[in-house]
Amino acid sequence: NGLDYTVNEVTTAVGAKQAIASAMMVIAGPGDEVLLPIPCWVSYTEMIRLAGATPVFVPVRQDNYELDLDAIRAAITPRTKAIVICTPNNPTGAVYSEKSLRELADLAVKHDFFIVADEIYEKMVYDGAKHFSVASISREVWERTITVNGFSKAYAMTGWRIGYAAARADVIKGIMAVQSQTT
């Protein structure tokens, strides 16, 4: 995906779900808000709440399930700590365009919030669609992105909970600290 990480910038997890939940505990807490484009996978909401943060639901465009950047802009507050995106999306199957991800990245840099990029379905693209990793845009975006992936979907290994998170070293260190006390 055009991404480079050192050994200190990656951690394994008991599935991508655990990686996302651990990341939430590191980057968000009471009083914080995490943007969540909807419809979305049901577990994101509870992971945000378990971290003590508040999910802020942001509708996607109804014509193609693409990110609605105007709605995202309107939802950003000084308490916004992150946005969780899943592309290709669960449950819609929408593959967010490079253009919309670049616009989202600009917002993350401007307002200094994280992008939690769930890329578990990256290999499941059809009809000429192309997956694009938001962290590949620039170093500034890479530093604000936690890329999460795993092997269960692409390799039909759903019973094998093998996931990982990739991010800057201080975030990964925090995720590993959470994992050391929860697994």
List each model region and its residues.
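Conserved core segment of the aminotransferase class I/II
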Residues: 139-183
